[in-house]
Protein backbone atom coordinates (compact mmCIF):
# COMPACT_ATOMS: atom_id res chain seq x y z
CA UNK A 1 0.00 0.00 0.00
CA UNK A 2 1.12 3.52 -0.67
CA UNK A 3 1.70 6.13 1.99
CA UNK A 4 -1.40 7.98 0.78
CA UNK A 5 -3.58 4.86 1.09
CA UNK A 6 -2.32 4.25 4.64
CA UNK A 7 -3.34 7.80 5.66
CA UNK A 8 -6.83 7.38 4.14
CA UNK A 9 -7.35 4.00 5.85
CA UNK A 10 -6.17 5.37 9.21
CA UNK A 11 -8.44 8.41 8.90
CA UNK A 12 -11.49 6.30 8.01
CA UNK A 13 -10.77 3.90 10.86
CA UNK A 14 -10.59 6.80 13.31
CA UNK A 15 -13.89 8.24 12.04
CA UNK A 16 -15.66 4.88 12.35
CA UNK A 17 -14.30 4.42 15.87
CA UNK A 18 -15.32 7.92 16.97
CA UNK A 19 -18.80 7.64 15.47
CA UNK A 20 -19.38 4.51 17.53
CA UNK A 21 -18.60 6.52 20.68
CA UNK A 22 -21.19 9.23 20.13
CA UNK A 23 -24.71 8.70 21.37
CA UNK A 24 -27.43 8.98 18.74
CA UNK A 25 -29.93 11.13 20.64
CA UNK A 26 -32.47 13.55 19.32
CA UNK A 27 -32.30 17.05 20.72
CA UNK A 28 -35.08 18.13 23.02
CA UNK A 29 -36.81 21.48 23.18
CA UNK A 30 -38.35 20.73 26.56
CA UNK A 31 -36.63 22.03 29.70
CA UNK A 32 -34.61 19.60 31.75
CA UNK A 33 -36.27 18.07 34.77
CA UNK A 34 -33.05 18.19 36.72
CA UNK A 35 -31.74 21.13 38.65
CA UNK A 36 -28.25 22.57 38.52
CA UNK A 37 -27.93 22.01 42.26
CA UNK A 38 -25.54 19.39 43.58
CA UNK A 39 -27.04 16.09 44.74
CA UNK A 40 -28.44 16.42 48.25
CA UNK A 41 -29.08 20.17 47.97
CA UNK A 42 -31.85 21.53 50.19
CA UNK A 43 -34.30 23.85 48.44
CA UNK A 44 -36.56 26.72 49.45
CA UNK A 45 -38.81 28.74 47.16
CA UNK A 46 -40.85 31.92 46.90
CA UNK A 47 -43.63 33.11 44.60
CA UNK A 48 -43.35 36.87 44.15
CA UNK A 49 -46.48 38.99 43.64
CA UNK A 50 -47.23 42.68 43.18
CA UNK A 51 -49.34 44.57 45.73
CA UNK A 52 -52.41 43.99 43.52
CA UNK A 53 -51.78 40.22 43.53
CA UNK A 54 -50.30 39.67 40.07
CA UNK A 55 -47.69 36.91 39.87
CA UNK A 56 -44.32 38.40 38.91
CA UNK A 57 -41.60 35.81 39.46
CA UNK A 58 -40.55 32.57 41.07
CA UNK A 59 -37.41 32.14 43.13
CA UNK A 60 -35.54 29.08 44.34
CA UNK A 61 -32.82 28.91 46.98
CA UNK A 62 -30.68 25.77 46.65
CA UNK A 63 -28.28 25.14 49.55
CA UNK A 64 -25.22 22.91 49.13
CA UNK A 65 -21.49 23.01 49.86
CA UNK A 66 -21.79 26.01 52.21
CA UNK A 67 -23.55 28.44 49.89
CA UNK A 68 -26.96 29.24 48.40
CA UNK A 69 -27.68 29.40 44.69
CA UNK A 70 -30.58 31.82 44.20
CA UNK A 71 -32.49 31.66 40.90
CA UNK A 72 -35.15 34.25 40.05
CA UNK A 73 -37.25 34.06 36.88
CA UNK A 74 -40.15 36.27 35.88
CA UNK A 75 -43.45 34.47 35.27
CA UNK A 76 -45.11 37.19 33.20
CA UNK A 77 -43.54 39.74 30.89
CA UNK A 78 -44.32 43.44 31.11
CA UNK A 79 -45.16 43.73 34.81
CA UNK A 80 -41.73 44.84 36.01
CA UNK A 81 -40.35 48.01 34.43
CA UNK A 82 -37.21 47.54 32.32
CA UNK A 83 -33.97 48.36 34.11
CA UNK A 84 -32.15 47.48 37.29
CA UNK A 85 -34.07 46.48 40.43
CA UNK A 86 -32.60 45.98 43.88
CA UNK A 87 -33.37 42.55 45.31
CA UNK A 88 -33.05 41.56 48.95
CA UNK A 89 -34.11 39.02 51.53
CA UNK A 90 -36.16 40.84 54.19
CA UNK A 91 -36.32 39.88 57.86
CA UNK A 92 -40.00 38.85 58.20
CA UNK A 93 -41.97 36.37 56.10
CA UNK A 94 -44.95 38.65 55.44
CA UNK A 95 -45.89 40.27 52.14
CA UNK A 96 -48.90 42.43 52.94
CA UNK A 97 -49.86 45.35 50.69
CA UNK A 98 -50.49 48.66 52.44
CA UNK A 99 -48.94 47.50 55.72
CA UNK A 100 -46.78 49.09 58.41
CA UNK A 101 -43.18 48.15 59.26
CA UNK A 102 -43.04 46.25 62.59
CA UNK A 103 -40.82 49.09 63.90
CA UNK A 104 -43.50 51.66 62.98
CA UNK A 105 -43.70 54.35 60.35
CA UNK A 106 -46.06 55.15 57.49
CA UNK A 107 -47.93 52.37 55.68
CA UNK A 108 -46.74 51.14 52.30
CA UNK A 109 -46.68 48.05 50.15
CA UNK A 110 -44.95 45.09 51.79
CA UNK A 111 -43.66 47.14 54.74
CA UNK A 112 -44.73 44.17 56.94
CA UNK A 113 -41.60 42.33 55.66
CA UNK A 114 -39.43 44.60 57.80
CA UNK A 115 -35.87 45.60 56.98
CA UNK A 116 -33.14 43.80 55.02
CA UNK A 117 -32.30 40.44 56.58
CA UNK A 118 -29.21 40.20 58.77
CA UNK A 119 -28.00 36.65 59.66
CA UNK A 120 -27.29 35.91 63.34
CA UNK A 121 -23.85 37.20 64.31
CA UNK A 122 -23.52 39.39 61.21
CA UNK A 123 -23.52 43.12 61.91
CA UNK A 124 -21.61 44.60 58.99
CA UNK A 125 -22.49 46.02 55.62
CA UNK A 126 -23.82 44.94 53.27
CA UNK A 127 -26.67 43.20 55.09
CA UNK A 128 -26.79 39.41 54.74
CA UNK A 129 -29.95 39.65 52.64
CA UNK A 130 -28.46 41.81 49.88
CA UNK A 131 -28.47 39.93 46.57
CA UNK A 132 -27.39 40.74 43.04
CA UNK A 133 -29.41 43.30 41.12
CA UNK A 134 -32.23 41.98 38.92
CA UNK A 135 -31.80 43.32 35.36
CA UNK A 136 -35.21 43.43 33.64
CA UNK A 137 -35.15 43.47 29.83
CA UNK A 138 -37.17 45.80 27.60
CA UNK A 139 -39.95 43.20 27.35
CA UNK A 140 -40.25 43.04 31.15
CA UNK A 141 -38.67 39.60 31.49
CA UNK A 142 -35.74 38.74 33.75
CA UNK A 143 -33.69 35.71 34.75
CA UNK A 144 -30.99 35.77 37.41
CA UNK A 145 -28.79 33.14 39.02
CA UNK A 146 -26.54 34.30 41.85
CA UNK A 147 -24.75 32.72 44.80
CA UNK A 148 -24.17 33.80 48.38
CA UNK A 149 -22.72 32.38 51.56
CA UNK A 150 -24.29 35.08 53.76
CA UNK A 151 -27.12 32.91 55.12
CA UNK A 152 -28.20 29.28 55.48
CA UNK A 153 -31.47 27.49 54.87
CA UNK A 154 -32.10 27.33 58.62
CA UNK A 155 -31.41 31.08 58.93
CA UNK A 156 -34.15 31.88 56.40
CA UNK A 157 -36.72 29.62 58.08
CA UNK A 158 -36.01 30.61 61.71
CA UNK A 159 -38.30 32.81 63.79
CA UNK A 160 -40.66 34.86 61.63
CA UNK A 161 -39.25 33.36 58.41
CA UNK A 162 -38.12 35.72 55.63
CA UNK A 163 -39.33 37.26 52.37
CA UNK A 164 -37.72 38.01 49.01
CA UNK A 165 -38.29 41.59 47.86
CA UNK A 166 -37.88 43.28 44.47
CA UNK A 167 -37.53 47.05 44.68
CA UNK A 168 -38.55 49.69 42.13
CA UNK A 169 -34.97 50.49 41.17
CA UNK A 170 -31.37 49.93 42.12
CA UNK A 171 -30.55 53.48 43.24
CA UNK A 172 -32.44 56.73 43.67
CA UNK A 173 -36.03 57.36 44.72
CA UNK A 174 -37.40 54.12 43.21
CA UNK A 175 -34.97 51.98 45.22
CA UNK A 176 -37.11 52.37 48.34
CA UNK A 177 -40.33 51.27 46.60
CA UNK A 178 -41.25 47.67 47.25
CA UNK A 179 -42.88 46.37 44.07
CA UNK A 180 -42.89 42.56 44.45
CA UNK A 181 -42.65 40.25 47.44
CA UNK A 182 -42.74 36.53 48.20
CA UNK A 183 -42.50 34.61 51.47
CA UNK A 184 -39.57 32.17 51.43
CA UNK A 185 -40.63 28.67 52.40
CA UNK A 186 -40.36 24.95 51.82
CA UNK A 187 -43.19 24.56 49.37
Provide a role label for each language-model segment.
Residues 2-84, 89-187:
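N-terminal leader/targeting pre-sequences
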Amino acid sequence: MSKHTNVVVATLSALVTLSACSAHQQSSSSPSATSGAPAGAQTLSAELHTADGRSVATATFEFANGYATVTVKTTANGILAPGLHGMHVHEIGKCEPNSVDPMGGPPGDFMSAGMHYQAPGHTGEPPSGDLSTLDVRKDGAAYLVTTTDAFTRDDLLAGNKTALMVHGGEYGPDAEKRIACGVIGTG
